Amino acid sequence: AHVVPGIDENYLNGKMTSVFFDTLVILIAVSLVALEIVVVLSASQLSEPFRVAELALNRRAAGDLRQYQSGMGNGRLANFIRTLNTYNATLRDKLKSALDSVKDVGRREKLSELSERSKLFVTDARQQASIMDARIPLFVFCFAEELQKSFLPLFVAEFYSENDLFSRDIMMGLPISAFMFVIAVFTPFAGKLVDKFGNKPLFLAGLVPAIGGYLMCYLAQSGNDIFLGRSMTAIGYAVITISCQSYIASVVVVENRARGMAVFVGVLMSATMCGTAIGAILADWLGFKAVFLFAIGFALVAALLGWGMLSTDLPEPELKKTPVNLSKSPIATLLRNSQFVLIVLFCAIPAKVILTGFLYLFVPIYLASLEATQSEIGRVMMLYSLIIIPLSPFASGFADRLGKNLWMVIIATIASGIVLLGLYQNASVAMVLGVVAALGGVHAFLKAPLIVAAMEAAEKSPDITRTGALSLLRTSERIGSVIGPVVVAGMLVVLDFGEVAAILGITVAILGLIMAALSFNQKSRGSYV
């Protein structure tokens, strides 16, 4: 007898294909990180200085000799504008001296007309805040947070002990549900804290519980420890995201709100994709716990970036007078605004149910039943973010031009339900891939307009601030995030995958149609436009 060595070509080809796609994922993640840095640097060092210089030159050419906004830094363009301001200040001082010395009434009137026409005594208000200030700090923190997403259930299973609160299967999903639940509970309080103490201090303060949660997970010896660590991190996540979202909402003008919110959504999507991919690779190389050390490191970097980049020079928040007979409770405030409640119940919550229940729970289980590999499951789930990232700016710009954010949200809600029907009696990995891609495209047209539509509805109430509306919206969305996996898991106990997808899709589409009918009825009565 003799042994003949051989190589299974199919196995080798499969491994090479897996390596190729893993390398591609890393390349995409690194490219997105580089893109975030390039966008911020180009905006702060090129676009904004040239915009400020162009505005100053156009005003000077038109005879407007005010003190122009010079921007930040000591670059050539900023120094050029400061030189113009010096010349204008010299003319202003000479004009002031002439006005003080001239006694003739006619000459004084002509000098006063020159002063009004040239605006020599006007000084532009200096606003240092920009959307780009929050982009990099938010991205780095969210990147740190998403590092554990791909392996958290496996991490809990590895450290499960008999003394944990529940059985092993329940404990594997409990930290995820706890994370969403804590965010839902704490977000309204986070919004109030931002209004009281400001965006920058709260961003930095939110990093304390976030880092504490990462450290607790690193030191964890049981599922209970991981559960507590993720709950602690959720407090920091709620504070930081509301702080950055309110910061962006404060800076952008009303006409560009959807585009400004698209920056927030785009950062979250980019960080989700990059963090999930890089975290999986780090866990494979170094182990689960080492990833939390990287999360702590990136969170500290986010703290340094937030300290250096976030500005305290923000426009004053709107101050609305609250009638004495109205409660200041956030829940009571929400219930009094019917349009806000409709958006939350029929659009925001269903969108999160689809995201957490379908994408995070249904898709992995369904693909595993179709004998897809773990790498294939990860790539399919990442496609959702990959679709949203490039489409979100286009969708938000389209919503700004159309000026119909509410109807954009309604149509996208109906479409997201219809998309899920594609899985009914279609059991294939390719069909799941197509549905996830289509869902990403639909949600690209939903995410930013949903935030704007909620703020527009909130502005109709005299006692809801911008930050309060955002926090209430986020709280409601987290409720959908908590109940989504529970609802889908309950249906999977008694129904097959195709039936669950069909029921979920039909339900969401019907909710969207009900929202359309109610909104059209309100519009016809003139109560909401």
Q: What residue ranges belong to the model's regions?
A:
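Helix-start (N-cap) segments at beta->loop->alpha junctions
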Residues: 4-22, 162
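Cytosolic-side ends of inner-membrane transmembrane helices, especially those
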Residues: 30-47, 61
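Membrane-proximal alpha-helical signal-transduction linkers
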Residues: 46-67, 81, 85-95, 99-102
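Intracellular juxtamembrane helix-capping segments at the cytosolic ends
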Residues: 239-252, 446-460
